[in-house]
Amino acid sequence: MYYWFHQSFYMAKALPFIGGWLADRLLGDPEGWPHPVVGFGKAISLGEKTLNKGNDRAVKGGVMALILVAGTYLLCERILALAGYFHPIVASILSGIGVFYCLAGKTLVKEVKAVFEAVDRSTEEGRKQVGRIVGRDTSRLSPQEIRAAALETLAENLSDGVIAPMFWFALLGLPGMMAYKMVNTLDSMIGYKNERYLEFGQIAARLDDLANYIPARLTAWLMLAVSGNLNKMDFVKRFGPAHASPNSGYPESALAAILNCRFGGTHDYFGKPVEKPYIGTNERTFTTEDMLIAIKTNSNAELAMGLIVCLISIIIH
């Protein structure tokens, strides 16, 4: 009896993560609900408008990024500590809510399904739908390019939106998870190599590269493992580093290996063509079956990572 009570106590340490994770799997990101990332975005926007001018833009942007990331970590840690003074259950509930808001597994799957359904109706509908989840110019994309963009984004955001947040939760708890989301939001807003953000956002972009270095490679390994394709790791090692990003190429190359297809090529960003190396060699037409395989791979990789995080939480505590 004591053994099972003892085990249940330590299992309870993983419950906030499990609760938040299951909530994301069930609810996704309901429209109209308040979201901390919206607050992150407002803080970044205010800082950028105030500081991105004059001299020393790289320094000012770097200081802003570091303050926002460290501030997010410390604020989250303090909120949980104060909640724990009232009752540990209050802290656990807040932690579970935080995990829910930091994960984006179901939402992205929903968006990718919507892209494939839209492009089956018309190319124009597909362009509009894929424009919701990619940064490239979608106005001239072909149906093939629309489907490819959706699949590439699904693979990349499995790392950014699911595996990486879970990784940082396992390492540093909810404060680490929230700090990662701030890093990711900074990169998505000011981490571009255009005239406006080239200097100001360079530290934010480097922070994102560092924060995703291990998670991106772990994501690729998980994708291959759950799909029974670990023998294709050499493919990932070959094409993963070819991507302009030091991280995005790994989950994308894993999916290309699984689907035996080719990603990459030239796309327009902010009115300028950007040439991306090809990932894979088999240029073929994408189908709904590819989307279903990719979604199944994502879901299984997320499940595997979630179980790993639960195990780590129990062992550590």
Name every feature range the model reports, one short phrase each:
Residues 181:
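Pseudouridine synthase
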Residues 1-178, 191-317:
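Hydrophobic alpha-helical transmembrane segments
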Residues 188:
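Glycine-rich phosphate/dinucleotide-binding loop and adjoining beta-alpha-beta core of small-molecule
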Residues 184:
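Substrate/ligand-engaging "lid" and interaction regions
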